[in-house]
Amino acid sequence: MNGTEGPYFYVPMVNTSGIVRSPYEYPQYYLVNPAAYAALGAYMFLLILVGFPINFLTLYVTIEHKKLRTPLNYILLNLAVADLFMVFGGFTTTMYTSMHGYFVLGRLGCNIEGFFATLGGEIALWSLVVLAIERWVVVCKPISNFRFGENHAIMGLAFTWLMALACAAPPLVGWSRYIPEGMQCSCGIDYYTRAEGFNNESFVIYMFICHFSIPLLVVFFCYGRLLCAVKEAAAAQQESETTQRAEREVTRMVIMMVIAFLVCWLPYASVAWWIFTHQGSDFGPVFMTIPAFFAKSSSIYNPMIYICLNKQFRHCMITTLCCGKNPFEEEEGASTASKTEASSVSSSSVSPA
């Protein structure tokens, strides 16, 4: 094995020289230069600095403006809540441990950080599944006269949390475990060892099939059908131009969220799967650290997508920030009006975020 396994940790360095120490008790500066830990701490501080205000603003603006409280937005707000969980439960912990060069908060801190990081990522993924199904049902109309309403949105919220907890909670109760990974200052699922009594192999296979592959297959199926339906509707001119435009804007926004999720999480998932299927192979601490910390940036991309692609949300946000006045009122007004009109013409979910 090209690493050192100990109680609740795996350090990617063979302990031939005797310098490997527990990441819960000693700085891990023998793995990489101390400056790298300072850089990770600064990166986490940046994510907190951006992630908290932008997600809090998303929640506040939606609560403040009644016209944004649509069933579809319940799912989008769910993402903001999950991102805030990641910021407070995960990012603050990782920033603190990076500044010390090891997981100074011990096993409890590792469980907290690993749990919130996994929970946030899974809520994001299953929220995208619910959004994809909603888009498919609204645009493709496999169920005639179906209208996505408040009850459906609440059921969707409950579903995302149930599925996310089904992935994040088992390592807390003995099915697999959370251990420090990479440079040993952030925690994740144990892909690295076959530790006796934890059944890591069965959990990792379960997680990759039920909580990664199947959700992505559902998303790809829904959007494959959706793109075909949009082209057919445009060719047949079955709906008004205003409704079609609103449908396209919502669909484009959600597709961008799916792409952003894949960009953030696919490298981490790929590296984790490689480590799991090549246990004992030689790899450095940075090999897992870079994709793991890159995945954490997912907490800021969803609200940025709302702001960039959703004119109605952007209009409400500017109004809130400018104390009830929008200096770009004339420019934004027409777009907002068209969105409101589209919302009344089509399904209640047509008006995005």
Swiss-Prot record:
Protein keywords: Cell projection, Chromophore, Disulfide bond, G-protein coupled receptor, Glycoprotein, Lipoprotein, Membrane, Palmitate, Phosphoprotein, Photoreceptor protein, Receptor, Retinal protein, Sensory transduction, Transducer, Transmembrane, Transmembrane helix, Vision
Residues bearing PTM N6-(retinylidene)lysine: 296
Lipid-anchored residues (S-palmitoyl cysteine): 322-323
A Pfam family annotated for this UniProt entry: Rhodopsin_N
GO cellular component terms, semicolon-separated: membrane; photoreceptor disc membrane; plasma membrane
Disulfide bridge partners, by residue number: 110-187
Principal place of residence: membrane
Cell location: Membrane; Cell projection, Cilium, Photoreceptor outer segment
Extracellular face residues: 1-36, 97-110, 174-202, 275-286
PANTHER family: OPSIN (PTHR24240)
Family: Belongs to the G-protein coupled receptor 1 family. Opsin subfamily.
Protein name: Rhodopsin
Organism from which the protein derives: Diplodus vulgaris (Common two-banded seabream)
Gene: rho
